[in-house]
């Protein structure tokens, strides 16, 4: 069974900052993204990994397709990807724009996924 701790709980702030520094140094055209299942989610499976290096030209719809495929979801299964646990962004937005406006102080871009919309509710990640 996967760990119940979030990425932020498993790694100190300093470790995360160093992770991002190394990632950006070695992969300057990749965006460091952490994608975790919403803590109250029961229907969708847990991803096999949480850390993703996403090419900076990819838009949100492509990222959603990638995550849906990794989760092996069928076309009629609902799936919502929330940036910083609270905001949905336009599917046409490039990930590099989302990163610039929404990245955490540690340098990672955090997202959670859920099977239901959670508008008006701040999700803790």
Swiss-Prot record:
The record's account of how the chain is modified after translation: The precursor molecule is cleaved by ATG4 (ATG4A, ATG4B, ATG4C or ATG4D) to expose the glycine at the C-terminus and form the cytosolic form, LC3-I. The processed form is then activated by APG7L/ATG7, transferred to ATG3 and conjugated to phosphatidylethanolamine (PE) phospholipid to form the membrane-bound form, LC3-II. During non-canonical autophagy, the processed form is conjugated to phosphatidylserine (PS) phospholipid. ATG4 proteins also mediate the delipidation of PE-conjugated forms. Phosphorylation by PKA inhibits conjugation of phosphatidylethanolamine (PE). Interaction with MAPK15 reduces the inhibitory phosphorylation and increases autophagy activity.
Keywords: Autophagy, Cytoplasm, Cytoplasmic vesicle, Cytoskeleton, Lipoprotein, Membrane, Microtubule, Mitochondrion, Phosphoprotein, Ubl conjugation, Ubl conjugation pathway
InterPro entries per UniProt: Atg8-like, Ubiquitin-like_domsf
Covalently lipidated residues, kind Phosphatidylethanolamine amidated glycine: 120
Protein family according to the UniProt entry: Belongs to the ATG8 family.
Record-linked PANTHER family: MICROTUBULE-ASSOCIATED PROTEINS 1A/1B LIGHT CHAIN 3-RELATED
Function: Ubiquitin-like modifier involved in formation of autophagosomal vacuoles (autophagosomes). Plays a role in mitophagy which contributes to regulate mitochondrial quantity and quality by eliminating the mitochondria to a basal level to fulfill cellular energy requirements and preventing excess ROS production.
Protein name per the record: Microtubule-associated protein 1 light chain 3 beta
Source organism of the structure: Bos taurus (Bovine)
